[in-house]
């Protein structure tokens, strides 16, 4: 097959591993920087161009779209879809999962475990908002943040009020969540492909830090999932309509709670922690599913 990988940097671990795994299985790979693409949108022969050249027809496309280029990246992916290229994850599913508030609303509708979350636009609502999530300590998150950036643990009510007021003063969209103390600064990344959790790792924050993201110095180790955790991860990915997803779960006294569903999960941490060839499993999934070029939107909302 001819497969395009949408990525801004061919040297990134995930991009290079996917290319390596696909070529090892006999496929022809082209890495396409979505920001270098421009589109001809018409009713007869829609096309994508880079530097004056029209891109050839691809059988499948693997989107590795960073959060900062979601708008343009998903526009390019939609164009691939219009041209009949099979997407690993569909543009509508990626857009859905990138909206943190919308994704939590969709998950709650499916009765999937979540931390209690509050959202408001007016400073006058802050006291009631904090009461909703159980007071301090609480977690305040920028809706546009990634990799733990824009996430604040407010340990006192006064600190929470000050941080929320500051963010609101900057016209930033934020949500406030209950702090799950029993998680102990750890979360679980479940790597979902299709209808299976093919790998899972526990990410532990550094001492004195509550964000367990590996980009923030957290450590990763292999973990055994409970049946409920496995089921929660699969249901969360399905609700978003994602074929491949990284589902982040906290272990709480109320059972597993979903923090986020990532449409472009990194491969380095999970492959090194578990020893599983995740890249090859993604390519195998494409091989089994690319026969149907009709793009069907999964999930609701």
UniProtKB/Swiss-Prot annotation:
Mn(2+) 2 binds at residues 260, 262. Keywords: ATP-binding, Ligase, Magnesium, Manganese, Metal-binding, Nucleotide-binding, Protein biosynthesis. GO terms for biological process: protein modification process; SOS response; translation. ATP binds at residues 141, 178-179, 187, 211-213. One of its GO terms (cellular component) is cytoplasm. Mg(2+) 2 binds at residues 260, 262. Residues 104-287 form the ATP-grasp domain. Pfam families: RimK, Rimk_N. Mg(2+) 1 binds at residues 248, 260. Belongs to the RimK family. This is Probable alpha-L-glutamate ligase 1. It comes from Shewanella frigidimarina (strain NCIMB 400). The lineage of its organism: Bacteria, Pseudomonadati, Pseudomonadota, Gammaproteobacteria, Alteromonadales. The gene is rimK1.
């Amino acid at each position: 097959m001819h497969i395009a990988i949408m990525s801004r940097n061919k040297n990134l671990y995930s991009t290079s591993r996917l290319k390596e795994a696909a070529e090892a299985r006999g496929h022809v790979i082209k890495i396409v920087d979505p920001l270098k693409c421009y589109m001809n949108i018409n009713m007869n022969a829609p096309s994508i161009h880079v530097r004056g050249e029209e891109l050839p027809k691809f059988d499948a496309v693997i989107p590795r779209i960073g959060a900062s280029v979601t708008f343009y990246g998903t526009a390019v992916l939609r164009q691939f879809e219009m041209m009949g290229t099979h997407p690993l994850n569909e543009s509508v599913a990626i857009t859905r999962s990138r909206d943190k508030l919308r994704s939590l609303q969709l998950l709650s509708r499916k009765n999937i475990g979540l931390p209690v979350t509050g959202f408001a636009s007016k400073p006058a609502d802050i006291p009631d908002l904090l009461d909703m999530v159980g007071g301090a300590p609480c977690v305040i998150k920028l809706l546009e943040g990634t990799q733990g950036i824009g996430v604040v643990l407010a340990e006192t009510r006064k600190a929470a009020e000050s941080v929320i007021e500051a963010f609101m003063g900057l016209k930033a969209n934020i949500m406030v969540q209950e702090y799950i103390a029993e998680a102990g600064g750890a979360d679980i990344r479940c790597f979902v492909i299709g209808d299976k959790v093919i790998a899972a790792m526990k990410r532990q924050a550094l001492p004195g830090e509550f964000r367990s993201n590996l980009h923030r110095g957290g450590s990763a180790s292999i973990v055994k999932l409970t049946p409920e955790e496995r089921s929660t991860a699969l249901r969360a990915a399905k609700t978003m309509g994602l074929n491949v997803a990284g589902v982040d779960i906290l272990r709480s006294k109320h059972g597993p709670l979903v923090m986020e569903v990532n449409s472009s999960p990194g491969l380095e941490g999970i492959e090194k922690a578990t020893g599983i060839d995740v890249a090859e499993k993604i390519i195998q999934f494409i091989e089994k599913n690319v026969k149907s070029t009709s793009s069907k939107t999964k999930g609701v909302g």
